[in-house]
């Protein structure tokens, strides 16, 4: 209804903050977010294809009432950076092995022999795990993180592994300051630290796309 009110016709993302059982609207981004695979896995809808069809003047073959939420999905952003200091780690990739298995999706441009440049964002891969519930998604993600092999550069994969082993994260209910407290960081709002906390999950009770 917000998009219809302003006459917007394309893919977009409405962002909310969750506090004390309530959702608070922040903003709308007129683009698809990095986390869009989470939405695609729990709805079965290809958002990029839908956006291209809209741009070409086509109508969507479904309505909001047709969209059903199935299961839970979690995404980890794999960055080419030191997992402790968050400093960039560009350079040649001597070996790259992507994880696989049931419910695992990997979006990446990495390959063995690729040279990670120092000029752009450090994101080199997205690993997404989908399962019938949060516990299943977490278990699959933990296996996927253990399967990742990257040699030649540093990545934040060890940080993700540590987060998924932490009982507080597995139990849910962590907030935006979780990583700050966990690692004893002094600057909770610094951009590299914000990007590092990328294990964001969505289920039928979390409306953000």
Model-predicted regions and their roles:
Residues 4, 16-19, 64-66, 115:
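N-terminal hydrophobic alpha-helix used for membrane targeting or insertion
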Residues 8-33:
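Conserved metal-phosphate-binding beta-hairpin within the catalytic cores
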Residues 1-8, 59-62:
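Conserved ATP-binding module of the ATP-grasp superfamily
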Residues 33, 37-209:
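Catalytic cores of soluble metabolic enzymes centered on carboxylation/carboxyl-transfer
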């Amino acid at each position: 209804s917000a998009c219809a009110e302003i006459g917007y016709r394309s893919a977009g993302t409405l962002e909310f903050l969750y506090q004390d059982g309530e959702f608070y609207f922040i903003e709308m981004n007129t683009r698809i977010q990095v986390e869009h695979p989470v939405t695609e896995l729990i709805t079965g809808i290809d958002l990029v294809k839908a956006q291209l069809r809209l741009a070409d003047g086509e109508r969507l073959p479904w309505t909001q009432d047709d969209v059903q939420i199935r299961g839970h999905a979690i995404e980890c952003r794999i960055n080419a950076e030191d997992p402790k200091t968050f400093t960039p780690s560009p350079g040649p990739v001597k070996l790259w092995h992507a994880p696989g298995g049931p419910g695992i999706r990997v979006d990446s441009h990495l390959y063995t022999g690729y040279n990670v440049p120092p000029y752009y964002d450090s994101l080199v891969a997205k690993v997404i795990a989908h399962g019938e519930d949060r516990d299943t998604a977490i278990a699959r993600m933990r296996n996927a993180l253990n399967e990742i092999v990257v040699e030649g550069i540093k990545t934040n994969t060890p940080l993700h592994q540590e987060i998924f082993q932490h009982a507080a994260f597995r139990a849910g209910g962590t907030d935006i300051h979780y990583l700050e407290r966990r690692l004893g960081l002094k600057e909770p709002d610094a951009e590299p630290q914000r990007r590092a906390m990328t294990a964001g999950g969505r289920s039928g009770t979390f409306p953000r796309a």
